């Protein structure tokens, strides 16, 4: 037997034993009120592995599975102002326009895709007979509109407009309280580089802005874990420490809410993640040109101002301008620090009207530098966006209870609205590029900017350099993902995809600054806002998505058709009964598709009903019962806890604590452990 095959054999044994350990821990935990017996579980795993490892008779390096300790470099790159639906709503295998759990507005009694319109909205007015607008393809007019809309704008990204669009959880004011352009979207042909990177590695379809507002609140959370609202972990009066950061105001002093309370006070003085990195002995560097679009918010903190005056290391690493060319060079030579932050120039940031195409050119250069650099085999590169930029998305994260510290505040612009959530907000494009996420599928855990901090904390701990960002709100730390489930350390693939060509971003010949948006708007005489298709839509065309699937990673969320697969079989509802059928490689058999209906109150609550697809969007079909039958009555439905560990999913009936299983083509609930692979499917 070849070394590779034996290594794979042992890895498979490790995964199998690990899955069994996970199940036994789960069973023990339920029996003991949530307290797991880690010692006995470890002995089970050891007993399962020793004979297999001995039989393999290989060096440890051949059999060992990877770990977070194998990651030597982490690269963060945050772009600007794009929403998930706006970019990836049509993508196959993600929670997009094909969402079977789409929210039904209590105001309209329709899925939120039906956005009410009237003549009070900003932008082009609808004809009097048109009462609603669906999401619409921005380049529906054809011709050169694929170039024109590159430099168009949507609407407002501020607190007021985005809370209005949310509308207390009804999501039905995107057009009325922003603009009809807000619900426009691109397709694959408009974003070939973005799609290629996301699908060649791991795309996240549950990554949320941390604050339902603009750039500074979100970028500051990305680097500190907080905006310092009242009762937050930072504490102290805003006039002393700064915050609460509600908008992009950067001038000294404080703005005021409509009742006169201080907000967005400057300078800010609470502790930042880079300071924790320095204390832990972790090297880091912000790579940015002098033109950085103001996207390095560390300059707003007094400690960085003081460090710059004294020419100290904190300022050299956090607020200086080594340039993006320095990043490309360091990546190529394998000289990147342990943690790198990439900050975009204005015209390459993708912030409307700055073009996705120019942003793609920068993304391609950064990805190429990382993937072709000498440290690619031990690097994790995380690409995210700060906030939605006035573009619509149809999913917002569950919010914390109102008594959670730092999570709610009296609406700063209209106190009559009462308490408002600070976040997490709508979803953003997000992908992780690394040898442990190659062809990784879709990551479904609720995630936000705080998640990147928590990933760094876990990574630092694995390297013996622990730190803890105490400024982060406790609810975010408890309920947002730390991204560890996104990486599959049982698979290691350093192959590099062929990336599509992207035209070189243009520069002004005099100033040498990038000027793509200016060139675009001048070429088309600023006629870049497409016609709003009032009265010309049908819902099927508006919500057309790519047919396909992606393997899932991470704890599950709603919003997708699923196949439950085990071995050669898939769960089925053929013949109006729960059964098992031979799985389809295309995952397009309707009777093998199911939909989850979430019963939880917070993101870590993983209780679901499992149903067949409904005949209407947002409605369930028939539910799986505890006796493994099907019922149209939700009261008859079994409640399952579905969790992800060791690369598979356990599906446990919460009443009997038995595992849903497919054994030799038969469906059962059994006491022994069973694991499924889940695929997210669009049809």
Predicted regions span which residues?
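Context-dependent free N-terminus signature
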Residues: 2, 29, 44-45
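Intrinsic-disorder-associated, low-complexity terminal segments enriched in Asp/Asn/His/Tyr and depleted
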Residues: 15, 37-38
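Fungal secretory targeting signals
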Residues: 42-59
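Basic polycationic patches enriched in arginine
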Residues: 11, 24-25, 30-32
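N-terminal pro-sequences and low-complexity stem/linker regions of secreted or lumenal proteins
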Residues: 60-657, 662-683
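Short linear segments in intrinsically disordered or otherwise low-structure-confidence regions
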Residues: 7-8, 12-14, 21
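Cysteine-centered motifs
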Residues: 2-5, 23
């Amino acid at each position: 037997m070849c070394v590779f095959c034996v290594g794979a054999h042992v890895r498979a044994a490790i995964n199998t034993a690990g899955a069994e350990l996970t199940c036994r821990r789960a069973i023990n935990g339920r029996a003991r009120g949530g307290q797991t017996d880690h010692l006995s579980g470890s002995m089970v795993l050891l007993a399962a592995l020793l004979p297999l490892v001995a039989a393999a008779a290989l060096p440890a390096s051949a059999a060992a599975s990877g770990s977070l300790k194998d990651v030597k470099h982490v690269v963060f790159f945050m772009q600007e102002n794009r929403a998930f639906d706006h970019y990836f709503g049509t993508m196959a295998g993600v929670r997009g326009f094909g969402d079977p759990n789409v929210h039904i507005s209590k105001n309209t009694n329709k899925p939120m895709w039906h956005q009410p319109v009237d003549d009070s909205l900003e932008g082009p007015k609808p004809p009097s007979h048109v009462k609603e607008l669906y999401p619409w393809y921005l380049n529906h007019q054809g011709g050169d509109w694929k170039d024109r809309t590159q430099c168009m704008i949507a609407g407002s990204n501020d607190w007021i407009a985005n809370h209005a669009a949310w509308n207390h959880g009804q999501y039905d004011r995107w057009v009325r309280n922003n603009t009809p352009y807000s619900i426009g979207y691109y397709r694959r042909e408009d974003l070939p580089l973005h799609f290629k990177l996301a699908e060649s590695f791991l795309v996240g379809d549950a990554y949320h802005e941390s604050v339902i507002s603009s750039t500074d609140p979100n970028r500051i959370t990305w680097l500190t874990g907080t905006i310092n609202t009242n009762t937050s972990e930072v504490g102290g009066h805003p006039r002393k420490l700064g915050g609460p950061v509600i908008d992009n105001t950067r001038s000294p002093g404080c703005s005021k809410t409509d009742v006169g309370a201080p907000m967005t006070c400057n300078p800010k003085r609470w502790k930042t993640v880079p300071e924790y990195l320095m204390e832990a002995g972790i090297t880091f560097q912000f790579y940015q040109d002098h033109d950085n679009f103001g996207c390095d918010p560390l300059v707003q903190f007094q400690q960085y101002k003081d460090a710059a005056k004294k020419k100290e290391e904190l300022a050299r690493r956090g607020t200086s301008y080594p340039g993006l060319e320095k990043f490309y060079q360091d990546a190529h030579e394998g000289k990147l620090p342990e943690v790198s932050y990439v900050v975009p120039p204005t015209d390459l940031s993708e912030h409307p009207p700055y073009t996705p195409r120019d942003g793609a050119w920068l993304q391609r250069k950064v990805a190429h530098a990382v993937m072709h650099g000498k440290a690619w085999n031990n690097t994790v590169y995380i690409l995210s966006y700060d906030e939605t930029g006035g573009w619509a998305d149809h999913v917002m994260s569950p919010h914390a209870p109102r008594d959670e510290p730092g999570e709610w505040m009296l609406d700063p612009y209209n106190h009559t609205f009462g308490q408002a959530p600070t976040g997490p907000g709508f979803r953003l494009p997000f992908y992780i590029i690394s040898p442990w996420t190659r062809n990784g599928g879709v990551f479904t855990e609720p995630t936000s900017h705080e998640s990147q901090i928590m990933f760094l904390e876990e990574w630092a701990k694995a390297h013996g350099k622990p730190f803890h960002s105490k400024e982060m709100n406790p609810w975010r730390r408890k309920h947002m993902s730390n991204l560890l489930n996104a990486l599959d350390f049982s698979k290691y693939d350093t192959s590099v995809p062929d990336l599509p060509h992207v035209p070189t971003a243009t520069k002004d010949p005099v100033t040498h600054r990038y000027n793509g948006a200016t060139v675009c708007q001048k070429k088309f005489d600023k006629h870049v806002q497409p016609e709003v298709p009032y009265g010309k839509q049908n819902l099927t065309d508006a919500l057309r998505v790519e047919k396909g699937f992606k393997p899932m990673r991470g704890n599950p969320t709603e919003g997708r058709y699923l196949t439950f697969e085990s071995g050669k079989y898939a769960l089925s509802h053929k013949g109006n009964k729960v059964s098992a059928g031979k799985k389809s490689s295309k995952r397009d058999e309707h009777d093998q598709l199911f939909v989850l209906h979430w019963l939880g109150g917070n993101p870590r609550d993983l209780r679901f009903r499992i149903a067949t697809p409904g005949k209407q969007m947002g409605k369930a079909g028939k539910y799986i019962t505890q006796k493994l039958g099907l019922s149209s009555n939700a009261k008859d439905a079994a409640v399952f806890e579905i969790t992800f560990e060791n690369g598979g999913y356990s599906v446990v009936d919460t009443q009997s604590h038995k595992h849903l299983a497919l054994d030799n083509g038969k469906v059962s609930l059994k006491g022994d452990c069973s694991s499924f692979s889940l695929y997210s499917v669009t049809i």
